[in-house]
């Protein structure tokens, strides 16, 4: 069975069920005190940090060193581990790492040039197709091509098509 304990708003002591004094301020803020001494000091506006027996004072003056001695866990530092990436072996990565910047720049420029040429080629092909389509459309318009069976647009006639 687990008991739901509360903390005294003045002294910081544990308050077990059925114990304590509950004070509800005008702004609906709830204060729970362990005994009338804490309640009295709170209403007299005494500072719990100045009273030696409160949890706040003990914490400020490092009195509960035995209680606070919780081990700080150090994170294990991860050792660098070299492994290959999908699509590239360790040898390829090492070779790229050791090659000179000039060689790397030259390879990058060559790749960019190749990409630009490919883009230009596709653009030229699209332009040629557009021109071809436009010339075909002009030839077909020149002949006076009229669709067969097309009715002239005009006002619609009819009564709405409802039940009679």
UniProtKB/Swiss-Prot annotation:
Signal peptide: none
Residue segments, region Disordered: 63-82, 117-164
InterPro entries the UniProt entry points to: L24e/L24_sf, Ribosomal_eL24, Ribosomal_eL24-rel_N, Ribosomal_eL24_CS, TRASH_dom
Pfam family, one: Ribosomal_L24e
Compositionally biased spans, kind Basic residues: 71-81
SMART domains for this protein: TRASH
UniProt KW Cytoplasm keyword: yes
Gene3D superfamilies named among the record's database cross-references: 6.10.250.1270, Ribosomal protein L24e
Ribosomal protein listed as a keyword: yes
Ranges annotated as biased composition (Basic and acidic residues): 117-133
Domain of life: Eukaryota
One of the record's GO cellular component terms: cytosolic large ribosomal subunit
Compartments, record wording: Cytoplasm
An annotated Gene Ontology molecular function: mRNA binding
UniProt-listed GO biological process terms: cytoplasmic translation
Keywords assigned: Cytoplasm, Ribonucleoprotein, Ribosomal protein
Protein family: Belongs to the eukaryotic ribosomal protein eL24 family.
Protein name: Large ribosomal subunit protein eL24
Protein's organism: Cicer arietinum (Chickpea)
């Amino acid at each position: 069975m687990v008991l739901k304990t509360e903390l005294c708003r003045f002294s910081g002591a544990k308050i077990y069920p059925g114990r304590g004094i509950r004070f509800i301020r005008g702004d609906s803020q709830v204060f729970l005190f362990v005994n009338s001494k804490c309640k009295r000091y709170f209403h007299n506006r005494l500072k719990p940090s100045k009273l030696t027996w409160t949890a706040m004072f003990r914490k400020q003056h490092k009195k509960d060193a035995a209680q606070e001695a919780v081990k700080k866990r150090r994170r294990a530092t991860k050792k660098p581990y070299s492994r290959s990436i999908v699509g590239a072996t360790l040898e390829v990565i090492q070779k790229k790492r050791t090659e000179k910047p000039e060689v790397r720049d030259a390879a990058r420029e060559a790749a960019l040039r190749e990409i630009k040429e490919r883009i230009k080629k596709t653009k030229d092909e699209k332009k040629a197709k557009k021109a071809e389509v436009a010339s075909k459309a002009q030839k077909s318009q020149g002949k006076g091509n009229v669709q067969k069976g097309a009715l002239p647009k005009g006002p619609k006639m009819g009564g709405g098509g409802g039940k009679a």
